[in-house]
Amino acid sequence: MRQFFTVVFGTVVGIFAFFFVLIALFMIIGAVGGAMSSMKAKDSYVLSLDLRQGLRDHSAGATVFGSTPSSVVDTARALNRAKDDDLIKGLFIRANQFGMAPASSEEIRWAIKDFKSSGKFVITHAQGFEGTSILPYRAVSASDELWMQDTTGFAVAGLRSESEFYGGVFEKFDAKPQMEQFYEYKNAANTYTQTGFTEAHREAATSYLTSLYDGAVEQIAEDRGISTDAVESILMSAPHSAEAALDAKMVDKMGHVEEAREYARKKAGGDSIKFKTVKAYGPGNNYSGKTIA
């Protein structure tokens, strides 16, 4: 019996000793990790933002497969936070040459301008602006220096929209869409009742696109320090070579992405400068600043 209690007591003591050692080990690891984090916190960084991956309007949380998608709002908040962070020296952007939503394009532009207001630089590199609309270009036009690969071209175009019409389809199945439509410019129902654009629908769509286009041209002209006529002239006469885009002040330098990246590193302070993605930097608890997306 005595041997039994001795074994039980020894087991209990052993368990407590094990957990004590385990807790102490975690505390040591935490202390070392904190010290390393403190050391890393002294590093200086250039933030990097890859707009080619596309951005959601708002963060949608983690996906089943892959990482959490970046969002326009989190990106804007992160840049607003970074402008007052002394460890962040600048921003390096990979431009989107495919397409971008109007609100996202304008929000990123304002976020870049807000970041620059602290005196920090923004360097953007584009592999080319070929076959894309004016919106991805407008997003980065406020960069301090806009680089483009010299082997590509500049063919930023205007805007267009497409609508599908199912008028007459339902009738083939002895069905009839019943919708209330108030005035001719309330055109949501036209998708199901018309076979093409009505005059009012076409006017509304054209007016909307013209407003977006004119606004983008004005902002680009402001950012590039040229007239709106000059911007429209190069857009209307596209495509252009990289050299022609440089002469027209639509880009500032020609070079490959590695050259632009190293240029940003040197501008920030040299080889000791590290790069950190805007997503990894994160918005923190910063809810200041205006967002429109």
What are these regions (language model features)?
Residues M1-T228, P239, R261, R265-A293:
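Small-residue-centered hinge/linker elements
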Residues H256-E258:
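Extracellular glycan-binding segments that recognize GlcNAc-based cell-wall polysaccharides
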